[in-house]
Every structure is written in C-alpha cells, then in structure tokens.
Amino acid sequence: MNGFTGRKVLLVNTVCGTGSVGRLVVGLYHTLMSAGYECLVAYGRGEAPSDVRAYRIGTDTDVYIHGALSRLFDRHGFYSRRATMDFIYMVREYDPDIIHLHNIHGYYLNLDVLFEYLKDCGKKIIWTLHDCWTFTGHCSHFEYIGCSKWMSGCYKCEQLREYPRSFGTDSSAVNYEDKKQLFTGINNLTLVTPSRWLKEKVEQSFLQEYPVVVVPTGIDLTQFYPYDENVSDGNLVFNIKNELELRNKIILLGVANPWRDRKGLAQFDMLSKTLSDKYAIILVGLNDKQMNSLNDRIIGLKKTNSTEELAALYSMADIYINLTLEDTFPTTNLEALACGTPVITYKAGGSPESIDETCGEVVERNSIQGIVAAIEKILNSGGQAYTREMCLRRAQLYSKEYRFLEYIQNVYETI
C-alpha cells in the first residue's frame, strides 16, 4: 500500500458492528488491518465484536442522561463531558496518525471537548458524513419538509420532534452557531460522503472550506445474491411465495426500518389503490400498528433479522420500489440489484445515484402515475434492459471490498 502501512488509525462511531454504519466501520477496520494499518474503534453504545479492538466511550448511564437532557433542552452533543474527556485522554495515549470520524451524534460525545482537541492535535482527520446533522441546528434530514434554513442559519425548527427529538426548548439557532464555530477552521480535515447529493449539500453549507470525497457505501455480495427457486437457496423463495399466496402475481417490494411517511409509507398506500389485482405489494419492516392499518391490497411483514430471508424477498420480487422522500444513499437499492431485481426510486436525495438506465428508473417525487408508468416500462422491456444480468453488473460496482479499497486508495493514501 505504497509505504503507508504501519500507521495508526482511530475510527469513531456511535455503534460498532451493528446498524449500517456500525457494520461499515467494522468492515473498514478489517480492511485496514489487512492492509497493514493498526486500528482501534471508539464507540458510544452497545457492544463491539470480539475480533475488533475497541474502546467504549462512556456508559449506558451517560447515554441516558445525555438523551434525557437533549429532549428537554435540545442541546444534543453538548453533554457527556466527563466521558469525552476520558476518551480524549485515551486518544492521547493511543496517539493515532489518522482519526476517522463517522457518526458523532447519538448521545455519547461532547462536541466542545472533542473539537477543542481536534483543532490542536495536528492529526490527519477524516470525517464521513452519513446524514445532514453536521451542518444543521437540529435535524439529520431536511429534504422531506423542503427546509433550507441550514444554508444561512437555523431557527424556529419545524422538526423538533424528529431525531434528535426534543420536547422542550428550541435551541436550533444556538446549535447551528456552535456547530459552525466548532466544525470550521480545522487543519488537515477531509470530508467523505456516500453520495454526490450529500457532497453538493455540504458544499452549500458552512463546511464548504473542506475537500469532499465521494465514496459510495458498499454491500456484502456474498450475502445478497439471486436466490433461484430451482436450487437450494430457492427453497426459501418457494416457501415464502406459497405462504403469502403469491403464485402468478407480479411482486413489488418495499423495505425500510423504520417505515414512516417520509420513507414512502403513505405513497405505497396510494400506489396500491392505483394498481390492478395482478400485482402484489409487499412491505418489509413494519411495526404492529402499521401492520394493522394497512389496506387489504398490501402484504405487511415485520422487520427480519435474517439476511437470507431478506435476500429471498429481494430475489422473488419483480421490481424493488423505493418511495423514500429523503435519504443520503439507501443500501436497500444496492441489495435489490445484487439479488438481480431492478429498482424504481423517487428523485430524492442520493437514492437515484445507485442505478442507471440498464437497471432501474427514477421518477419525480410524489408522482404515483410516474411510478405506474415506470413499472409498465420495466415489465414491457422485452429483455432489452432491466435484466438480472444488468442488475448484477451494476451491483458489482458496490461490493464492500471494492469500496473499502477505494477508501484506502482515494482517502487514506492521499491525505
């Protein structure tokens, strides 16, 4: 790796090994270790895998207190002072060459303490942004409500009840100014985003002084691949189809966790009332209340923790439909493609970036008729596009190994 091996890396994230970002961090950890780097993961909640060298920042009690105070005063990121001071002491002892931040929200770090250190430490710093929280006064996403206050200064936040939820004071104005002061003026900082869309937003924010590298998220292609009914994996597909009485149906699949209107739940309700009964819509990841409120034209399934079951569902679907109204770079699109299934998505956030004209369609937001037209276009393509082979070819671009290597070559070895 061009003489860069042996350098010490500190990876920082809310969780280690769980959730999409936690799994990404662990995958990057192992890739860096294999490339000759020395690594340590610092995280704030839950447990770390046994094969990862890790440091827990604070305790469950620290997280609970931080969360409770944030709900009262809307000052997420400005508690956990002692836990963060202890963490910085450990960082000084470990003395990394590179500090790679991921999600630093999640009720476990004090921004004042952390960035006082980062501004003076002289280390190379990478910060991968997975949402928009870094440059807003409160929220992690703003596209759904069409808010642009983040471009000049937040105030009177319309999303106080969204993560990081607050039931008390609106501190979005002071949060914005504090973040702007803390997050700017850092030497040797490189930002990474998973999509061009998020890169563009960063370049319109107070973070515009920093270089931004786009490294799309990767997925595990040994877990997500086509399950055929005539081979061993296909038994699961066969059983699911029979159990849900889906024989001779055109299957349209949606997956989210959690489901909300901003993830397209209400859109699917409207779509189901537009399509004929030759179609079956399956939504995966619903809670009990949502399951009970579905109309009888939608089949609802709870969240599955089985990768095999999820891959089988993707594989048996004729089309994967993502009606999200805001997202940075949804991995469900990639998982569907990896299982050989074409994708239809709204033109929202970074969702369209994972597909091209060979494997999917992009539709203007809130256009149910546009979704119906895209469904018909894919089903009537006659093998000229949207084939399994074309979807798999596209998915190869997002193998986790390829993307982790891109991190090393395009970020670690260039800073």
Where in the sequence are the language-model features?
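Membrane-proximal helix-turn-helix segments that form the acceptor-binding/catalytic region
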Residues: 120, 149-191, 200, 206
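Nucleotide-activated donor-binding/catalytic signature segment of Leloir-type glycosyltransferases, i.e.
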Residues: 285-308
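A charged, aromatic-enriched C-terminal amphipathic alpha-helix characteristic of glycosyltransferases
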Residues: 366, 383-413
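Short alpha-helical donor nucleotide-sugar binding micro-motif in glycosyltransferases
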Residues: 312-317
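Aromatic "clamp/platform" in nucleotide-sugar-dependent glycosyltransferases that forms part
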Residues: 325
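Conserved acidic donor-binding segment of nucleotide-sugar-dependent glycosyltransferases
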Residues: 357, 361-368, 377-383
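Conserved donor-binding/catalytic core segment of Leloir-type glycosyltransferases
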Residues: 192, 237, 243-263, 269-272
